[in-house]
């Protein structure tokens, strides 16, 4: 919606499609507290577990000039020339399906990428937005206009639950390939990554 247009145009520049041996997932460049441009990439642990991160490839900026809103079909493909390969696992945690990679090269400045900010305060957002590559398609958006629930997923681990996630998005959908995509709050900060929905 118009209330998130500035954040959308900024944060979509952080999102990428991660290609592994026989699968793909979404994720995002995420900032650190030093704000030094270290190429950290947040994604889902189930995408990276047992895989050799040095073989991963990352595609950025795959945005359609004429996206069919809220569908995975009917979109035209945009340019696919911002690709970089190789990464190192820096952290992962299976209970929350979290994986943090460091891409082995700096992101070229000419790509005009951004490193998304994040918020771990636990403050309940007004609404949430996922930016992702469902089924490996061009970038799409899913939005839930309700505040998410904070649920006990695996004691003592709490996660955000999109109400009725399997069909509960008010705009768009998530599907295989969306895993690992950043979940943004109403302020445009990452509050988690997509798992199980």
What are these regions (language model features)?
Residues 1, 168-169:
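Active-site-adjacent structural elements in folded domains
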Residues 1-162:
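Serine endopeptidase catalytic core focused on the charge-relay Asp
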Residues 20, 128, 170-173, 185:
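Exposed boundary/loop context
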Residues 28-36, 172-195:
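Catalytic nucleophile loop of clan PA
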